[in-house]
Amino acid sequence: MQHPAFYVTGTDTGIGKTMGSTALLHALRARGHRAVGMKPVASGCEHTPHGWRNEDALALQAASDPQPDYAVLNPYALPAPLAPELAAAEVGVTLALEPIVQAFAQLRTQAEVVVVEGVGGWAAPLSATLDQADLVCALQLPVVLVVGVRLGCINHARLTAAAIAADGLQCIGWIANEVDPQMERIEENIGMLRQRLAMPYWGRIPWRPGADAATQAHGLQLPR
């Protein structure tokens, strides 16, 4: 894999960033890479005997090989299912880059590739003073965009790609994730996206209820 780490963002919240990220981990592992996931900030956690745990972060941990310690994979586990800025304020936490940078450095020593999953859509802030672009710059990562294929996705994808470029960051690929089984003319919409998005197409995750990430990884077309 040309890039030893990248940041996965989406066109919106709820469009399948975690499925995209875990499928990427399985695809990388199928190529023989040691690949681990990371969820720097997760809001909406359940209290367990081991501490606060987030469902998406646990999915990334399960898809990783080797499996990192949870606290390293998810430095900020915030209980409330709110925007990170609000969820952090509820528990008196101030989100900072340094703990994330340190955790990322640990993960880089454990694997050949680190897949870092963001929050919400690209413009969703991390805090009152931090945007996701600040984190991506600090970690020196390229970006992979997951497009939730539903009505309006062409507009959302183009706006997100433009925002990433405006932040001075590189988007190295995009993934089509089918999230609306009722959507008509999916093939044509994906074709229009391929014509209009400048970055390479990394494949498609079909609508397949109940399918696990390892199965969905078969639809990805990662660069060598």
Curated annotation (Swiss-Prot):
Keywords: ATP-binding, Biotin biosynthesis, Cytoplasm, Ligase, Magnesium, Metal-binding, Nucleotide-binding. It is found in: Cytoplasm. GO terms for biological process: biotin biosynthetic process. One of its GO terms (molecular function) is dethiobiotin synthase activity. Its EC number is 6.3.3.3. Substrate binds at residue 43. It comes from the Bacteria. Homodimer. This is ATP-dependent dethiobiotin synthetase BioD. The lineage of its organism: Bacteria, Pseudomonadati, Pseudomonadota, Gammaproteobacteria, Lysobacterales.
